Amino acid sequence: MSSLRRPAGSTFRRVSWECSVNALDQLIGQLSRLPGIGKKSATRIAYHLLRTDPSFTRGLAASLTEVRERIHPCTVCGNYTEADPCDVCADSARDRTTICVVEQPQDVAVLEATREYRGLYHVLMGVISPIEGVGPKDLTISRLGARVKEGGVKEIILATNPTVEGDTTALYLVKLFEGSEVRTSRLALGLPVGGDLEYADRLTIARSLRGRTLLSS
C-alpha cells in the first residue's frame, strides 16, 4: 500500500486554522468575563460578530477603546464622565445641600431617570464586605467625609442596595456622621430585599426617594 502524502501547503492551512480557533476561544473567554454573560451567551455573541459586517466589529472595537480613553471618574463625586467635573456636579441649579450616596456609577443613571432627585451624588465604588475583604478604606468614604466637611451639606441619602452588604455600609455611614449637623436618611421600603437598584422600575425608586426614612437628625 502506498503511503498517503500530505498535500502541499496543508501544514500552513492547519496552523492558520488553529490560530483562528485560538483567537475565537480567546474572544469567547473575554466575553464570558462580562457580568451576566456565561459561556453559552459568550459563544453566541462571538459567532454573531463573525457573521456581521467587518465595519461593525471595527466600530465596536474603536468604541471600546475610545470609552476607556475618554471616560473617567469625576474627581468630585466619582461618577463616570467625559468632562470633569461631571454635568451634575457642574450644574449650579442642583441642590447642593443634599448628597445621595450610591454603590456604583450606573446607580446614578437609574436615579436620574426618575427625574425625582435634584441633589448631588457620591459613588462609593462598592460596599463594605468583610467576606470579600472590602473595608471602608477600600471605598471612597474618606472623600465623602471631606465633601461634608467643606460645609453646606444638610442631608445624606443612603441609596445603597437592600442587601446585607448594602445595609452594613449604610449603618457604617450613619455612625460616621452621627453627632454632626448632617442628617442621614435611607430609601423607603419598596425595593426588593437582596435586589439591585439598577433593576428597580422608575416609579418604585421615585416613591422610595419621596418616602425615605430619616435615620439621624
Annotate each language-model stretch with its function.
Residues 1-20:
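N-terminal amphipathic/basic-hydrophobic helices that include classical n-h-c signal peptides
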Residues 22-24, 29, 33, 43-108, ...:
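Cys/His-rich Zn2+-binding cysteine-cluster or related metal-binding knuckle/ribbon modules and their
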Residues 25-29, 43-47, 58, 62, ...:
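Solvent-exposed alpha-helical segments within well-ordered globular domains of core cellular machineries
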Residues 118, 145-157, 161-217:
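Long C-terminal interaction/binding lobes of large macromolecular proteins
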Residues 42, 91-160:
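Extended interfacial segments that mediate partner engagement and assembly in macromolecular machines
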Residues 3, 33-35:
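A generic structured-segment signal
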Residues 60, 73, 85, 107, ...:
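Glycine-rich, flexible loop/turn motifs
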